Amino acid sequence: MKKGYVQVTDSYERILHWMLALSCLLLCVTGLGMMFQTFNFIGLLFGGLKSLKLVHNFTGLVFAVSLILVIRMWWKEAGVFVLPEDLDWCMAAGGYLWHVDKVPETGKYNPGQKAFFLVVAGGGILMILTGLIMWFPTTLPVELVRWMYPLHALGFVAIFAFFFIHLYLGTIGNPGSVDAMVTGWMDKKVLTMLHPKWVKEMEHEGKLVVYGEEKKSDAHGHS
């Protein structure tokens, strides 16, 4: 680890992030193999349609557990918009779509990241509930079960659309930020540029962990 890097995530956060991401990706692939004839070849890779459905269903359970834990873990920081700062950031589009002299400062997660989190949370819950009903279709009237398929697809479309934006902004769009979910550490310069308010708050509270530096004392003199 390089000197001057800041710890932004712990191992628990990273494990849950990748459990959710990989299970979601596998659900997308297996789901496409079941929904569209064009992607029937995916079923062959898993040993047939029956095996594909089993993989999809049990991956859904992993996704459900991961999502519940992720919502519980990140809701306070990523699930609530803070006004007026988040609105100011949105009005400036975070500086991504046009030039702004100064991007409004936000907390650990900006409104774009919060929006993605809420879409994944809402779309994920929708897919879990509809998926369970589709798994056990005899539990409800046929007319109601039929509605589960388009609703399930709606959750997929919402998450999949935001996924590519998240992937771009987490890699090419913000070089260096991918380290947060790989090693748990980010270059302090990059972090300060992307989340200056959070860095200031953590420094003020004495909670900022910088590799190669001793933890600073907080305002009350505790380390």
Q: Predicted segments — roles?
A:
Residues 1-223:
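Membrane-embedded alpha-helical bundles that constitute the cytochrome b-like, heme-associated redox core
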